Amino acid sequence: MENKKTIYFLCTGNSCRSQMAEAWGKKYLGDKWNVLSAGIEAHGVNPNAIKAMKEVDIDITDQTSDIIDRDILDKADLVVTLCGHANDVCPTTPPHVKRVHWGFDDPAGQEWSVFQRVRDEIGARIKKYAETGE
């Protein structure tokens, strides 16, 4: 029986940032963590997020866009908000749930280079967490 911790990445629409974070999380943390993502709303996975991750050989076509699940939120070991809106309106978490904010620009509707930059920034941040625990 696995006894993995759970990390829950949250953003507004579970469309871009949290989808990319889930993918990077599975790559860098998947051996020790259950990696999940959700949004305040579910906007569907942005095709450019799929394309951006494909560029780094990570396939997210099977990931789904989901709204925040209260049960997962209450049982997560770590909740990471990726945008100010999610940080501001995220439901309260119990005291035992560690919550941190790692803010990233919203690439939706932006130039392709913004998707690539945000993808790389999220990947680097999660890799740092995997290596240092911070």
From Swiss-Prot:
Pfam family, one: LMWPc
Major localization listed first in the record, in broad terms: cytoplasm
Gene3D superfamilies in UniProt: 3.40.50.2300
GO molecular function: arsenate reductase (thioredoxin) activity; protein tyrosine phosphatase activity
Highest taxon of source: Bacteria
Example GO BP: response to arsenic-containing substance
Catalyzed chemical reaction(s): arsenate + [thioredoxin]-dithiol + H(+) = arsenite + [thioredoxin]-disulfide + H2O
Keywords: Arsenical resistance, Cytoplasm, Disulfide bond, Oxidoreductase, Plasmid, Redox-active center
Catalytic residues of the enzyme: C11 (nucleophile), C83 (nucleophile), C90 (nucleophile)
Record carries keyword Coiled coil: no
Subcellular location(s) per record: Cytoplasm
Broad class of enzyme this protein falls into: oxidoreductase
Disulphide bond pairs: C11-C83, C83-C90
Residue runs in coiled coils: none
E.C. no: 1.20.4.4
GO cellular component, as recorded: cytoplasm
Similarity comment text for this entry: Belongs to the low molecular weight phosphotyrosine protein phosphatase family. Thioredoxin-coupled ArsC subfamily.
Protein name, entry field: Arsenate reductase 1
